[in-house]
Structure formats: C-alpha cells, structure tokens
Amino acid sequence: MSYYNIFLDFLSYIGSGAALFIKIIAVIISVMISVAYLVYMERKVIAAIQLRQGPNVVGPFGLLQPFADAVKLIIKEHIIPFKSNKICFLIAPIITFTLALLGWAVIPFGADVIVNDGYEVIIPNAIANINIGVLYILAISSLGVYGIIIAGWSSNSNYAFLGAIRSASQMISYEVSIGLTIVTVLLATGSLKLGEIVVARHNMPYWIDLLLLPMACIFFISALAETNRHPFDLPEAESELVSGYNVEYSSMPFALFFLGEYANMILINAMAVIFFFGGWYPPLNIGFLYIIPGIVWFVLKVVALLFCFIWIRATIPRYRYDQLMGLGWKVFLPISLLWVVLVSSILVYTDSLPSNNKQYVSHAMHK
C-alpha cells in the first residue's frame, strides 16, 4: 500500500471521527436545551392548571427564565457536609448526569432513505445504530440507581439515605415491569435494533398495535415510577424527606442531579415513542403528513407524553410507599407476565412471529 493510500485512509478516519464527534455534541446540546425548556414548560402548564401566570418576567413570556435559573445555580456557593464522604459525594451527581446522556447514543430521531441496487434502504439517524440497542438502553437505565445510592450514603444524612433506599427499591421494582413490556414488543418485531423496531411496528397490522396497547399503558405508568415522577416521587417527597437523596446538594452538583432527572424523563418518553407510538412516522399513516420531517413528528410525540407527565403531577396526589410497591409487584408484574404469554400465544396461533414472517423488518430496511 502506498503512502498516498495510507494518507487517504487516515483522512477518511479523521473525517468519520469528526462527524461522530459533531453528532455527539449536537445531541448533548439538544438534550440540555430540551431539559431547560422542559422545566419552563412544566412551570407554565402547572401554573395554567392552577390559574396562575407562571414565569413571565425574564424575557418575553418568561422564555429566558431557564437561563436565569442556570446562572443562579452556577453562582451559588457549593457546600460539602463536614462528615460526608467527599469523593463519593462529588462523584454521585456526575454518575447520574453521565448515564442520563449515555442512553441517548442509540435513540433514532428520524431516518434517511437512500437507494441501493434498486432498493430504498432506511438508515436511522442515531449516534450508534447497534444490534443490541434495547439491551444497551436497559443496562444504562438500570445503572442510574447507583448515583442515587452513592449520593444518599455519602451525604451522611438520614433524610438523604432514606430517599436513596426508597429510590433504589422503587426503580428496581418497576424495571421488571418495563422489561416485560419491552419483551412483548420484541416478540412482535423480532429485533433489538431500535430503528428496526420503529419501522417494523409501522408496517404491522393494526390488530397488533391494539394487542400491545395495554403494555403501552403499563410502560407509561412504570416510567413515572422509574423517573421518580409524581405520583411516585416518594424518594423526593418534600413533606416527608425535605428533598430526598439530594437534600445536602447545592450549586452545580444539585444542577447535575436536576439535569440527569429531566434528561431521563425525556429519554424514557423517547423510548415509549419508539416502542409504542410509531417513532418518527406520522400518526395513522396519513399520506400528506409525510411532508413534515420525521424528526418533527418524533419531537411532537415526545412533547405530548411529557405534557401528560406534567399534567399528572398537577392533578394526582402522591401514593403511599406501600401502595407504590404493591402496585408494582401485585398488579403490574402479574399483568405483564400474563400479557407476555398472551401475546406469544396469539402471535404463534396467527403465524405472525417474526421468525415465521419476515415482511415487517425486511420491508423496514429495504422498503
């Protein structure tokens, strides 16, 4: 191989690396801006429900309020409790924030269509379109509890430790139900690639969508518990635990927890859109709606689910802890197990398993 070819290969490698780096930076910036304006949206929606105005001073209609809040958090004094484990105390919010961002690596925001040998090949727009995208995102979401446990233990506070224990047991309990709901989707699509799942779901008959609808409801409610959102925000119950596992945090460490929590909230709604609501495709497969880019539909669906999260926070009272655990283990777990068996049986009986009928995924990637 000549030096010229080696130089061309090196330039190609540098170019692909630069493109990947730009993708990563773009996703991180987009998530951070989304978190900032999700907080603004939450305050505005709750204010409207409670017949208030909400943020309306900083900028037109209060649109610059998120930046004012960010400046306030940055310039606040950073206090470390005297008897805390200082290293773990500082590492915990970094773990939570980092894991919240890592999950976005496999999320497809849309897709490009290219023609190859007469076929229209659909290429999902994701940082990494890996073969085990579902397993990756489940693993990343499961690791998030470590940051909370470390924060509660290292703070040397009874309130923080109790909040961390609550959060750990709650997240572990509802991850089982979330995993089983995703299993039903995998049975119907036969793929662990998030992009293939979206397109396979798009090409399925409507009766399979109706069959998976109860699992979508369980996934959505379990997502509230998984992200410690109302009415399952027991780890952060202000009336019981002051603020929960992050009670001793201030300034940027608190901001990292805050960013991680809301980034996880957006992420799990993006997962719901991918698994149950058609991803980047327009609703009901209406032809003229395809004029609108897929990423716009994806964002609109995620925003709609986030609005439901906020609406629930403003209207439904908090569960007791025993009710929370009972709902997860005594209601959602048996129903999820039963529905996995039911979906498997119906797919086998109707000869609709992906192993027997490949048209969904093959049509997905070679349309």
Swiss-Prot record:
Compartment(s) of residence: Cell inner membrane
InterPro entries, A to Z: NADH_UbQ_OxRdtase_su1/FPO, NADH_UbQ_OxRdtase_su1_CS
Pfam families according to UniProt: NADHdh
Membrane topology: Multi-pass membrane protein
GO cellular component, one term: plasma membrane
Keywords: Cell inner membrane, Cell membrane, Membrane, NAD, Quinone, Translocase, Transmembrane, Transmembrane helix, Ubiquinone
UniProt EC number: 7.1.1.-
Reactions the enzyme catalyzes: a quinone + NADH + 5 H(+)(in) = a quinol + NAD(+) + 4 H(+)(out)
PANTHER family, A to Z: NADH DEHYDROGENASE SUBUNIT 1, NADH-UBIQUINONE OXIDOREDUCTASE CHAIN 1
Family recorded in the similarity comment: Belongs to the complex I subunit 1 family.
Protein name as catalogued: NADH-quinone oxidoreductase subunit H
Gene (name only): nuoH
